[in-house]
Swiss-Prot record:
The lineage of its organism: Bacteria, Bacillati, Cyanobacteriota, Cyanophyceae, Synechococcales. Residues 266-301 are annotated as: Important for dimerization. Its cofactor is a divalent metal cation. Its EC number is 1.3.3.3. Keywords: Chlorophyll biosynthesis, Cytoplasm, Heme biosynthesis, Metal-binding, Oxidoreductase, Porphyrin biosynthesis. Pathway: Porphyrin-containing compound metabolism; protoporphyrin-IX biosynthesis; protoporphyrinogen-IX from coproporphyrinogen-III (O2 route): step 1/1. The gene is hemF. This is Oxygen-dependent coproporphyrinogen-III oxidase. Substrate binds at residues 98, 114-116. GO terms for cellular component: cytoplasm.
């Protein structure tokens, strides 16, 4: 059922993800100018380890974390067995690079990235994605982020983005708030080149429908490796232009308070719903690295309601709902009319 990966699969993916960590850190340091990443290497008692890099109190980033890990073990956590029961009973290996950036300026969005690879006996798969969480809405920023990742997916297969975009909307959703964490991006998991592209749990959702409307996956290991490589390389051109455009925008305590309020939603998702956080904690991962995704400051306010017609209201009513960001002309017209396009 499962095609065997190449003999050097672990070393090859490890090197890809280490290189991605290096490139991202270099690009972020260059644009921040003031902040520098501090690296801390760590070893996991059960096998493997990683290197965590954190930048704090830069000119752009209040906190930025870019982590690499390579871990292995004998007993799979329940979060994996429930998704892939055929992997049970095998020793496992997992490697990944993850990143979360929390800028100071509320006009610069928070952003998350994660690319990973997993093996357990004959079972292997790739997963990953990137998603953007603005605090103040600008459609042009959203479009740049989505377009770069769409192009990266289409270098491998024209159908992938049709599934990965709604899958991202589905995954980064706060069920207890009935809202999206941000404006999405791409998300994929359990990709082994067989069966349907969509491997999530919502068979009635948009991602599942998109997957059913196209042919089953016929990608091999090398194709999926290239997908991770292309999408990883798409990150800096998807995000740095937003920083360049927004970093000089002035803001007041009002914008800062709203940013901290919306960061609270980020915390809620990561601690309640995120599978990566759950996997890390279930496998005795390094807690400091796992919780690196949390912002240094956040706030909660009972019964908050944004003023009607304000940028804050546009964010909560439109930019926390799945949209056709690239092609919806009515959305484009609305954003132009309300000065939230560019």
């Amino acid at each position: 059922m499962f095609k065997e990966p190449p003999k050097n699969s672990r070393e090859k993916t490890k090197n890809l993800l280490l290189t991605l960590q290096n490139k991202i850190c270099s690009g972020l340091e260059n644009i921040d100018e003031k902040g520098k990443f501090i690296e801390e290497s760590w070893i996991r008692d059960e096998g493997g380890g990683g290197r965590s890099r954190v930048l704090k109190n830069g000119s752009i980033f209040e906190q930025a974390g870019v982590n690499f890990s390579e871990v292995q073990g004998k007993e799979l956590p329940q979060s994996i067995v429930s998704q892939r029961p055929e992997a049970k009973g095998h020793e496992w290996f997992a490697t990944g690079t993850s990143m979360v950036l929390h800028p100071k300026n509320p006009y610069i969005p928070t952003v998350h990235l994660n690319y990973r690879y997993f093996e357990a006996g004959p079972v292997w798969w790739f997963g990953g994605g990137a998603d953007l969480t603005p605090f103040y809405p600008y459609l042009s920023d959203v479009r740049n982020f989505h377009n770069e990742h769409k192009k990266a997916c289409e270098k491998v297969d024209n159908d992938l983005h049709k599934v990965f975009k709604p899958w991202c909307d589905e995954y980064f959703f706060l069920k207890h708030r009935n809202e999206s964490r941000g404006i999405g991006g791409i998300f994929y998991d359990y990709q082994d080149g067989s069966g349907n592209i969509y491997r999530g749990n919502n068979q009635n959702g948009e991602a599942s429908k998109a997957s059913q409307s196209i042919s089953k996956s016929n990608l091999n290991w090398d194709n999926l490796f290239s997908l991770a490589e292309n999408c990883g390389q798409a990150f800096l051109p998807s995000y740095l232009p937003i920083i360049e455009k927004r970093a000089s925008q002035t803001y007041s305590s009002r914008e800062r308070e709203f940013q901290l309020y919306r960061r609270g939603r980020y915390v809620e998702f990561n601690l309640v719903w995120d599978r990566g956080t759950i996997f890390g904690l279930q496998t005795n991962g390094r807690t400091e690295s796992i919780l690196m995704s949390l912002p240094p400051l956040a706030r909660w306010e009972y019964g908050y309601k944004a003023k009607k017609g304000s940028r804050e209201e546009f964010l909560t009513s439109i930019f926390t709902k799945p949209q056709d960001w690239l092609d919806d002309k009515d959305l484009e017209k609305f954003c132009l009319e309300n000065n939230i396009f560019d």
